Amino acid sequence: MTDRVRASHILCKHLGSRNPVSRRTGRPVTIDKESALREIQGIITQVKNDPGKFALIAQERSDCGSFSRGGDLGFFGRGEMQKPFETATFALKVGDISGVVDTDSGIHVIMRTG
Protein backbone atom coordinates (compact mmCIF):
# COMPACT_ATOMS: atom_id res chain seq x y z
CA MET A 1 0.00 0.00 0.00
CA THR A 2 1.31 3.41 -0.98
CA ASP A 3 1.88 5.82 1.91
CA ARG A 4 2.47 8.98 -0.12
CA VAL A 5 1.53 10.20 -3.57
CA ARG A 6 2.32 13.23 -5.68
CA ALA A 7 -0.34 14.95 -7.72
CA SER A 8 -1.23 17.99 -9.74
CA HIS A 9 -4.75 19.30 -10.02
CA ILE A 10 -6.95 21.91 -11.60
CA LEU A 11 -9.60 23.41 -9.33
CA CYS A 12 -12.75 25.15 -10.47
CA LYS A 13 -14.35 26.99 -7.55
CA HIS A 14 -18.02 27.94 -7.49
CA LEU A 15 -20.37 30.00 -5.32
CA GLY A 16 -20.84 27.04 -2.94
CA SER A 17 -17.11 26.47 -2.41
CA ARG A 18 -15.85 26.91 1.14
CA ASN A 19 -13.72 29.91 0.07
CA PRO A 20 -15.19 31.17 -3.21
CA VAL A 21 -12.25 33.37 -4.20
CA SER A 22 -9.91 32.42 -7.04
CA ARG A 23 -6.28 32.25 -5.88
CA ARG A 24 -5.26 32.87 -9.50
CA THR A 25 -7.22 36.10 -10.03
CA GLY A 26 -7.73 37.20 -6.41
CA ARG A 27 -11.39 37.87 -7.19
CA PRO A 28 -14.58 36.22 -5.91
CA VAL A 29 -15.91 33.49 -8.18
CA THR A 30 -19.26 34.16 -9.82
CA ILE A 31 -20.26 30.78 -11.26
CA ASP A 32 -22.63 28.22 -9.79
CA LYS A 33 -21.78 24.56 -9.23
CA GLU A 34 -23.39 23.43 -12.50
CA SER A 35 -21.27 25.88 -14.48
CA ALA A 36 -18.13 24.79 -12.62
CA LEU A 37 -18.95 21.17 -13.40
CA ARG A 38 -19.34 21.95 -17.12
CA GLU A 39 -16.05 23.86 -17.06
CA ILE A 40 -14.12 21.05 -15.39
CA GLN A 41 -15.63 18.48 -17.76
CA GLY A 42 -14.28 20.51 -20.69
CA ILE A 43 -10.89 20.70 -19.01
CA ILE A 44 -10.91 16.93 -18.40
CA THR A 45 -11.48 16.36 -22.12
CA GLN A 46 -8.57 18.69 -22.95
CA VAL A 47 -6.07 17.13 -20.55
CA LYS A 48 -7.02 13.55 -21.40
CA ASN A 49 -6.48 14.35 -25.09
CA ASP A 50 -3.12 16.01 -24.38
CA PRO A 51 -1.77 15.21 -20.87
CA GLY A 52 1.39 17.19 -21.64
CA LYS A 53 -0.65 20.38 -21.41
CA PHE A 54 -1.93 19.71 -17.88
CA ALA A 55 0.48 22.19 -16.24
CA LEU A 56 -0.20 24.90 -18.80
CA ILE A 57 -3.97 24.54 -18.44
CA ALA A 58 -3.60 24.60 -14.64
CA GLN A 59 -1.64 27.87 -14.90
CA GLU A 60 -4.35 29.39 -17.08
CA ARG A 61 -7.50 28.00 -15.47
CA SER A 62 -7.06 26.67 -11.91
CA ASP A 63 -8.51 28.62 -8.98
CA CYS A 64 -6.02 27.01 -6.55
CA GLY A 65 -2.83 28.72 -5.45
CA SER A 66 -0.97 25.80 -7.00
CA PHE A 67 -1.76 27.32 -10.43
CA SER A 68 1.66 29.03 -10.29
CA ARG A 69 3.32 25.58 -10.08
CA GLY A 70 1.23 24.13 -12.91
CA GLY A 71 -1.13 22.60 -10.35
CA ASP A 72 1.63 20.65 -8.55
CA LEU A 73 0.71 19.88 -4.95
CA GLY A 74 3.87 17.93 -4.19
CA PHE A 75 3.79 14.73 -2.14
CA PHE A 76 1.13 14.09 0.48
CA GLY A 77 -0.06 11.22 2.61
CA ARG A 78 -3.39 9.91 3.76
CA GLY A 79 -5.31 12.32 5.96
CA GLU A 80 -3.65 15.43 4.50
CA MET A 81 -6.27 16.25 1.87
CA GLN A 82 -10.06 16.28 1.82
CA LYS A 83 -11.30 12.68 1.73
CA PRO A 84 -12.78 12.68 -1.82
CA PHE A 85 -9.53 14.19 -3.16
CA GLU A 86 -7.40 11.68 -1.25
CA THR A 87 -9.51 8.71 -2.34
CA ALA A 88 -9.41 9.73 -6.00
CA THR A 89 -5.66 10.40 -6.00
CA PHE A 90 -4.65 7.18 -4.26
CA ALA A 91 -6.86 5.21 -6.69
CA LEU A 92 -4.98 6.58 -9.71
CA LYS A 93 -1.83 5.09 -11.20
CA VAL A 94 1.09 7.42 -11.93
CA GLY A 95 0.26 9.33 -15.11
CA ASP A 96 -3.49 8.73 -14.84
CA ILE A 97 -6.00 11.58 -14.89
CA SER A 98 -9.17 11.48 -12.79
CA GLY A 99 -12.70 12.25 -13.72
CA VAL A 100 -14.67 14.86 -11.78
CA VAL A 101 -13.72 15.09 -8.09
CA ASP A 102 -16.07 17.18 -5.93
CA THR A 103 -14.87 18.56 -2.57
CA ASP A 104 -15.74 21.47 -0.27
CA SER A 105 -13.08 23.48 -2.13
CA GLY A 106 -14.76 23.06 -5.51
CA ILE A 107 -14.53 20.69 -8.44
CA HIS A 108 -11.19 19.18 -9.45
CA VAL A 109 -9.44 17.11 -12.06
CA ILE A 110 -6.35 15.37 -10.69
CA MET A 111 -3.28 13.90 -12.37
CA ARG A 112 -1.17 11.56 -10.26
CA THR A 113 2.48 12.31 -10.87
CA GLY A 114 4.25 10.19 -8.27
Feature map (PLM): residue ranges:
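Proteostasis/folding factors centered on peptidyl-prolyl cis-trans isomerases
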Residues: 1-32, 84-114
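Peptidyl-prolyl cis-trans isomerase
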Residues: 38, 42-83, 114
